[in-house]
């Protein structure tokens, strides 16, 4: 199955010896080193000012879709204070000759959340160049909690820290722990609905809806970047249109972002896009469609019509974008093989339905049908099991798991769900490579991981995450931009930096510009690559030579410097 994702990049000639196409015109900067004018780059020499760091002699990509320039970058007090020819008047001089220098990458759709307390450096993300990470996606966030749940859990320790109730408590825990990357979070609609309405398929009453809006307003006031929906999951899928619109009007009031994991990403994907757009139209909220895809072979032809729906909305004046990770396999929970109607209620209630002959028959038929639509058991990877004795299933495809268990496909799925109390991670290989290229190359697209922070060490190193958690951005730049040349480097970098910064309303990140926060990468364009695989995911990317987070030299020659972690809450 590894051949479905060729993640090894082929070495190329130094990027300075190749031309970069911009607007159909070859940029001579890559060939001659000629300095081009840019609105973000000053010209001339500056040797009087002393800097904390000078990144010298690199090809500077500002994050704008403009030709690169050969220049130095001066950093002082965590900010970019000069972009020019600067000499060596500094405490830390970094030679970036033959290297790309660009803004730190912004992962607008991640699931890092509480993992950042276990791996505060942000190991798997910072090694692929991510300096800002946005969590709380797909309708789930590590907050808020009801008064009752907070009282029940506040005296327990979570990763060694007191429990929190709202976003401000979670942010405080991150600050006290210190973090190596910048972090912000959506608030999950599913969590709000769970608190107020519960986990069953019922409409919110007017009073409940008023309470949901009040909770959302509070989280946004405390710093949430927006509201995320996970309409393929419970309990978010049980919300009604009126509920969504009322909540999104609160989002629009704050000029925050509305992100949606749509109700369907396969047979009814076009209808799901239309629903997402209609909710944005009726509420006035800015829309981010999460990990846009067409799953299963019988839906691969739908990508052009999907994009037409999105671009028609954008042409009508709607603020709409989408994001995507550069892999043809998705990642989710094994409970996706249970139909939504059977996922109501608590885990105990759901597990009981696996024992009831009538409901088990319904679930079995749905599960086997979905296995077939995904391409068979050889297209389903069990990414993480946690129960003692189940380690042998981690990293194995479903057909391999069947051989280990001595059971058929359904009985193996059922056993894993029961023994793991529904908590099983999986990956499904259900997407087409050509569609992936089309989506990534769209002007409204941004690059994401859709993954969490991991580390090869400790508990997190025992899991088998999707390789995107270690290599989405390096895979995109190395495989698709350098090797396959489907867009110029400045456009690619903008999708990873300035475009998500604009969507998040970040006023001082996403560009290399005087006065901006010094989140800066030095990249070896010849070697940048994702080396993580589905079988061996815990491998750091190659080619990210240096990473600066708020001016602090966090990675040097690809290794953690031991510095005090400098990430902030955005």
Residue positions per predicted region:
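Acidic, glycine-enriched loop/beta-strand segments at the rims
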Residues: 52, 61-72, 424-430, 435-436, ...
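Divalent metal-binding pocket/active-site signature
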Residues: 221-276
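C-terminal cap of metal-dependent C-N hydrolases
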Residues: 356, 438-444, 449-450, 454, ...
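Metal-associated gating/positioning segment near the N- to mid-region
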Residues: 93-165
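N-terminal secretory signal peptides
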Residues: 1-14, 38-39
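Histidine-rich, glycine-flanked metal-binding segment
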Residues: 24, 39-53, 59-104, 119, ...
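N-terminal export leaders
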Residues: 12-28
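Active-site neighborhoods of metal-dependent hydrolases
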Residues: 174, 179-182, 186-206, 212-233, ...
